[in-house]
């Protein structure tokens, strides 16, 4: 009787519990289940990607690294590894594993944490809609959602969602992204052992992270391989081979094809200003105007220019010092590995920027030094890479204590064209921008030595004094007012009293090197960058007129004071404005605003535009084409026989440009172009200080431009600047600028506006 009562009691309890569970499920849980729209139209969180014009990756912005892959492109062996490990009956069940679910539910009711009974479908449900809380409600919701997912999606579609959505550590979502993160490979490039390691990550990505817990990760990988063997996904020979296959870990955050971090940050900021935080997850692809070849040339040229500058000057004290004798005594047994380990541990606190690697000098000989690098490599630097030692004025001292380059000192080392070079982490900065003068399309931009070291963009953010590079705009204003390239200007001492200037001090500017040539043609004054010629020309045309005139080139009028010192570039300009201003001379008179975004593609492959998009179509002409032509011819002479004659090494007749140096050698500039390409280089310190003796624009900035242009113009035919209407070419006497017969062999051709052509050959000089 008691047995019957017990059976009835248990049966009643089960029935009532079932009714309660059904009520709980259908009245309290089912109404709260989310719709499956996200799965039917799957849009994974994808980072913002920035590309070159050719489509090579520059940068990626977003918290989740994801590289979406279609299920048809996933290697079958990768699928097999996942099925064997996560859900071996995946292709047989309808979303749930009943035996596993009953076991998990029973343990949950008893308050015992359950072990994994989740199918792949259930993991998809959880990853898209639910938390990982181990509660009954969440588990029931997961089951119901899994059943719904199986009703609406095929097994292949479910597997594709899983392959791309699952978190696998190191901010990587999806197996294709994880392959790149852990191995720097695509999924299709992995061997069986590497696939098995990835397949073991979903269970506990942090615990089985091979970077942090290598031994645990390998143990888990072996479990995956054993499961694949046990369930017939691989045979015995493949299993044994996989156990011996190498696991070549190689961390890769993002595979960048081109180093252009400054332009990437400019793009990111523009998009963030317009679209906000969603840019980091909406899968936008931005194709810039940056060209692979040009950007790589620019990076190399700036780097070489900085290294050459460092090697021209007295080295600083080492970044640090390690007493190698004491370390050697600790390892008197001759254990070199332990010594290297201790040295590299010390070197870890010194930063690596670009490919400037910290290292310690361990041995010094007259023509060779031995170095241990931060990564443990032992290298030798030979004579070609030891120019810094030649500039160490204390090197010949008898005691090593006074030397700045010495054993135990911490310096930086860089491999340049297969030669190691001893150098130091630069304190100086340099920048380069290059663009098409006819469109404004930026093809290369280097905002500074290294973006990680200093994110300040010297091309777009820095206001610097242009110095003598500003003179062409003064001469352009003068030509528009009737002065000609043949006009004589007195290159002699200039003095103005404080009363004349209405200031507290007299003003007595000087030419560079303090040399003066007397009456000098305007053209020669520009090519030799004569300060007195520029000052007297500005005084003749009036500084206020010049201020109004040059503002049409895009300069901020408030930063261009209408004083005579403007002739020496005492103003403030941004390099990006300066290059677009010079492009006016290159393109026949048009002001083209520099731009760097070619197109933006959204996740639906539709092209979108920023409100701030720049279009240079129908750009108005800001100066007379004759003015641009004459200025171009004068700027060609700067290279032909002036301060930039070093650029003749390029052996081109279609290039023009101007050097620039500010007072006390604080800023060095060069800008140069041909009709199809223009580039500007700047060199200086963030906190203004002298670059050092003779560090003019022609020495510090021009070589960078030459190195860049050598490659940028390689293979491009020379282009002739067409002479516009309204120009009269006529020979002049080079000594006094007066007209002479066109048959006069001693005469040289000069260009004149037809309305300013000196018909009466009147002699005229600006004093």
Outline where the language-model segments fall:
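N-terminal type II signal-anchor transmembrane helix
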Residues: 1-51, 89, 109
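Conserved catalytic neighborhood of penicillin-recognizing serine enzymes
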Residues: 107-134, 188, 255-259, 438, ...
